[in-house]
């Protein structure tokens, strides 16, 4: 297990991710500047508002530092974070980091009023009960590259995907009391790193 995980803290529900990591006894660093990445062994890009997140990442000069960080460290993007790690987004106002070979549509399930909670199978966690997935103005993954693995689906649409050391989720695992998704991020990627 890693010692320190960064949570991008420019906008969005980063405090909820921090609380989930603390529940798992992981020290967190709230990342607001490039230098905050030093000492982090992984990074979570939280949900929020992707056009605002684009502007803030630009303003804080975080694009290249985050891209360089992925050369050695895993990243998990949730909701707007999934939009930010995508290769392509259906909105020209967004400048994605292009870390995972997926195309994403913003707010694909509708407006805030159309947000919903549902229980979803977790096939990559053997014998696990269903996960309570919270979708808030959620994006939808429309296309995936040949190296992208689909870990969870809802009505045939990918909602959690992985490529190399990048994990993208269209829902909010931090808004539940269930730590399984965060634990997977910590255990899967850091066990794999240890084997290299």
Segments predicted by a language model, with ranges:
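Cysteine-nucleophile active-site neighborhood
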Residues: 50-121
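Amide-donor transfer/coupling interface in amidating biosynthetic enzymes
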Residues: 106-196
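N-terminal beta1-alpha1 cap of cysteine-dependent amidohydrolase-like domains
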Residues: 1-59, 65-68, 179-183, 187-196
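Redox-cofactor binding/interface segments in oxidoreductases and associated redox assembly factors
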Residues: 45, 77, 169
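Short, well-ordered secondary-structure micro-motifs
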Residues: 18, 86-88, 146
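Short coil/turn connectors at secondary-structure junctions
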Residues: 2, 40, 71-73, 94-95, ...
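A secondary-structure boundary/capping signal
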Residues: 10, 78-80, 100, 137, ...
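Hydrophobic anchor at the start of a short beta-strand
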Residues: 28-29, 75, 166
């Amino acid at each position: 297990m890693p010692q320190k995980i960064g949570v991008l803290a420019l906008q969005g529900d980063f405090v909820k991710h921090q609380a989930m990591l603390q529940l798992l006894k992981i020290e967190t660093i709230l990342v607001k500047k490039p230098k905050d990445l030093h000492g982090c062994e992984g990074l979570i890009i939280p949900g929020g508002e992707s056009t605002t997140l684009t502007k803030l990442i630009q303003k804080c000069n975080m694009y290249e530092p985050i891209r360089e960080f992925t050369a050695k460290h895993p990243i998990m993007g949730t909701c707007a974070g999934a939009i930010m790690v995508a290769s392509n987004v259906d909105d020209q106002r967004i400048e994605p980091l292009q870390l995972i070979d997926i195309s994403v549509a913003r707010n694909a399930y509708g407006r805030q009023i159309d947000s919903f909670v549902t229980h979803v199978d977790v096939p990559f966690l053997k014998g696990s009960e269903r996960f309570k997935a919270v979708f808030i103005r959620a994006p939808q993954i429309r296309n995936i590259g040949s190296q992208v693995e689909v870990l969870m689906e809802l009505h045939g649409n990918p909602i959690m995907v992985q490529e190399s050391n990048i994990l993208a989720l269209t829902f909010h695992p931090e808004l539940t009391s269930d730590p399984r998704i965060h634990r997977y991020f910590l255990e899967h990627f850091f066990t794999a790193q240890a084997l290299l």
